[in-house]
Amino acid sequence: MNRRRRIYEGKAKILYEGPEPGTLVQFFKDDATAFNAKKHEVIDGKGVLNNRISEHIFTQLNRIGIPTHFIRRLNMREQLIKEVEIIPLEVVVRNVAAGSLAKHLGLEEGTILPRSIIEFYYKADALNDPMVTEEHITAFGWASPQEIDDIMALAIRVNDFLTGLFLGIGIQLVDFKMECGRLWEGDMMRIVVADEISPDSARLWDITTNDKLDKDRFRRDMGGLVEAYQEVARRLGIMNENDTPRPSGPTLVK
């Protein structure tokens, strides 16, 4: 069996060379990290759940005409994706005050914001991913003004879709993080949604109880992370009651 070439390894995922030109295999790890990896733990089953949830969301986004890098899920831990040039920005869309926004602006957690707020963070672990403005982004050439417009338009569309999706299953979308990349198709380039969208990258609260169904359970030592992710998957209709993720190692694509 030939080992695939590892292209990149991040905190929660590994990218391998894909079976066809222009493709990659995205592997979801069980690693849970917080505070820029200062807190780290391996939680069995987390990667399987994130793979399934992100697959479901990206499939729906593709279906309604929001372009993404997602092609298809390969197995319990891996997806086939289009190779894109990642823009070094984390795009955060906030609907409710929580996390750093509540802390920095002195807002009570759970306060509904006057409107959705889009923030940009420069992807640099050594700098703790600092918040940046559109001025920084264009001055340093991370993205052009037109690309920023495209990214913001995508962020608004994704937020509208996710808000409705989760509202329909009794979950409030507090905020979420997404990444974008440049997808080259011949001489044409377009901005697409990349990375993942899962409880690792979104704050999800039960509408009735305000129970946290996301990675804040790990950040705040609340426990029950896998159970919370399972509940999200169950409500989305992508995992049965008895379909519990089992620990497993990397699965190679033959």
Curated annotation (Swiss-Prot):
Name of this chain's protein: Phosphoribosylaminoimidazole-succinocarboxamide synthase
Family named by the database record: Belongs to the SAICAR synthetase family.
Pfam families per UniProt: SAICAR_synt (PF01259)
InterPro entries for this protein: SAICAR_synt/ADE2_N, SAICAR_synt_PurC, SAICAR_synth, SAICAR_synthetase, SAICAR_synthetase_CS
Alphabetic keyword roster: ATP-binding, Ligase, Nucleotide-binding, Purine biosynthesis
Disulfide bond annotation, renumbered to this chain: none
Gene that this sequence comes from: purC
Protein source organism: Brucella abortus (strain 2308)
High-level lineage: Bacteria, Pseudomonadati, Pseudomonadota, Alphaproteobacteria, Hyphomicrobiales
Signal peptide (UniProt feature, chain positions): none
A single cellular component GO annotation: cytosol
Record EC number: 6.3.2.6
GO biological process: 'de novo' IMP biosynthetic process; cobalamin biosynthetic process
